[in-house]
A protein has these predicted regions:
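GST-like domain detector, emphasizing the conserved glutathione-binding G-site
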Residues: 1-58, 159-174
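Surface-exposed helix-capping loop/turn segments at secondary-structure junctions
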Residues: 3, 73-85, 126-131
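Active-site rim elements
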Residues: 6, 54-61, 80, 103-109
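Residue-level signal for nonpolar/aromatic packing positions in well-ordered secondary structure
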Residues: 17, 71, 90, 122-125
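Amphipathic alpha-helical packing segments from all-alpha helical-bundle domains
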Residues: 55-74
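Extended, well-ordered alpha-helical scaffold segments
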Residues: 59-63, 110-124
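GST superfamily/GST-like fold recognition
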Residues: 81-106, 111, 121-122
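Acidic/histidine-enriched, glycine/proline-rich intrinsically disordered or flexible terminal extensions
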Residues: 135-174
Length: 174
């Protein structure tokens, strides 16, 4: 484990951290990635397809508020979910809001103040801030040029890539 540890030492907190990470991975991934980001950004820019506007509207009106209501009940007033250092739960949850921010989504801080503060503190942490600089620098770089751009920035990259010039669909139905 890194120091400080990403999993709380208390067994009940550790179980809760695992649950929150799983909630982020499954429910938030479905809502924020597949039903929202994919429709607005990926389908048009990668596949040349029109996104499902009805799905986006329904997600914004119904599904995202349900997720945020749940998170508001879990969110700490200050610090992070399990104290003063980041946990796997903080990272897993905040990552989806970084992604959603790329398509101009922001948490309504008046409606979900604790969640807005919590994710804001997490995204401002050194780990996220370092990645954000790299992400922001390559966000608008054509895919074919991203590897060289990352290398020029000193980002850690693999010795070789298996990328191709054309995107390939995965096995999940989108």
């Amino acid at each position: 484990q890194p120091d400080p540890a990403l999993f709380p030492s208390d067994i009940a907190d550790r179980a809760r951290a695992r649950w929150l990470e799983e909630f982020a991975d499954t429910r938030m991934g479905d809502v924020f990635i597949w039903r929202f980001f994919n429709q607005i950004a990926i389908r048009p820019s990668v596949w040349g397809e029109k996104g499902d506007r009805e799905m986006v509207d329904r997600t914004l009106k119904e599904e995202i508020p349900t997720v945020l209501d749940y998170l508001e009940a879990e969110a700490p007033t200050d610090g992070f979910r399990f104290g003063n250092s980041l946990s796997v739960a903080d990272v897993a949850i905040a990552a989806f809001f970084r992604n959603a921010g790329w398509v101009r989504f922001q948490i309504d801080a008046a409606r979900w103040p604790k969640t807005a503060g919590w994710t804001g503190r997490t995204l401002a942490s050194p780990a996220f801030a370092t990645l954000a600089k790299i992400e922001d620098a390559v966000l608008r770089v054509p895919i074919a040029e991203q590897r060289n751009a990352l290398k020029a920035m000193g980002a850690p990259i693999s010795a070789e890539t298996y990328a191709t010039s054309a995107p390939r669909r995965g096995i999940m139905p989108l």
